[in-house]
Structures are given as structure tokens and as C-alpha cells.
């Protein structure tokens, strides 16, 4: 975090970029869009081969601008099976699809192990096909509204 006064507790999440030889990994924890934008505005190089997608792939994180700046070849979403909150959100999945990132999700694949020798990145599982990972956007919107007092996602 760059500030000491965030409105959302998740924006206090630690964001770490790890570089090993020619491979780079960006771990965003539960950071949400406010933190993402703060990082981009700081001018730090966020480009990474692998992105651990923020806040379980929620629409409140991983903005299009942030994902485009990171431009990952691989994206890992850590999320529970049949998440009550409807995560990951379709908008985040679409953003990752649009940049061509290979997708790995813990709810679909279980434990994901990533290995790097500094040149190549290897996974213990095969990447998912995007059509199989999509969930109806309306169901996400309904869950969000139910959890946030009737407010729309865009609010």
C-alpha cells in the first residue's frame, strides 16, 4: 500500500513483483482497483509473465488498464469452488481472454504448482479453455446487488 487511509481493507494488501532471471511474477493478493491504479500512477514497471489475479478475480480489481499494463502470458485466479460472491467475474475473465493470457483457476483445477528455471514457466495442470470458465454475467450482477444493498456493479 502507498497510503495509510484506504476505504477498503483489501487495498492494504501487499503487492509483490518477483523477478527470477528472465521470468517475472506479480502477486496482487486481495488488492482492488484503487490499489491497482495507485501502482500504475507510481510509474512502477508492472509487466509480468504471470499475474496472480487480484481479489479472486472480482470485478472490483484487475481493471482493464491494469491487466493491459501487466500483459501477462499466464493468469492464476485463486478462488473457492462455487464462490458465493460469483468470483471470478466475467468482466475479469474477458479482460484476460482479450490479451491472450493462459488461465489457471483453483476452483476448476485444484492446487496449481508453478515452476520456473528463469527461462521457462511450467505448470502442473493444463490451462483452461475460456468458454468453459465463463459464468453468466447476470448471475454475477444479481449476487453483487444482493450483497451490496441493491447497488449495481457499476455504482
Model segments located where?
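Core dinuclear metal-dependent hydrolase active-site scaffold
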Residues: 1-50, 108-155
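Cap/insert and terminal regions of metallo-dependent hydrolase folds
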Residues: 38-111
Amino acid at each position: 500500500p502507498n497510503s495509510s487511509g484506504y476505504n477498503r481493507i483489501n487495498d492494504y494488501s501487499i503487492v509483490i513483483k518477483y523477478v527470477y532471471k528472465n521470468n517475472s511474477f506479480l502477486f496482487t493478493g486481495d488488492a482492488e482497483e484503487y490499489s491497482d491504479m495507485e501502482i500504475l500512477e507510481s510509474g512502477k514497471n508492472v509487466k509480468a509473465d504471470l499475474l496472480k489475479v487480484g481479489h479472486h478475480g472480482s470485478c472490483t480489481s484487475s481493471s482493464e488498464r491494469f491487466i493491459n499494463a501487466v500483459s501477462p502470458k499466464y493468469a492464476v485466479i485463486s478462488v473457492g469452488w462455487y464462490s458465493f460472491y460469483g468470483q471470478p467475474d466475467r468482466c475479469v475473465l474477458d479482460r484476460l481472454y482479450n490479451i491472450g493470457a493462459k488461465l489457471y483457476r483453483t476452483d476448476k483445477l485444484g492446487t496449481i504448482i508453478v515452476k520456473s528455471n528463469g527461462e521457462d514457466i511450467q505448470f502442473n495442470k493444463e490451462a483452461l479453455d475460456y468458454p468453459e470458465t465463463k459464468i453468466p454475467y447476470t448471475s454475477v450482477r444479481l449476487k453483487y446487488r444482493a450483497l451490496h444493498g441493491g447497488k449495481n456493479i457499476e455504482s
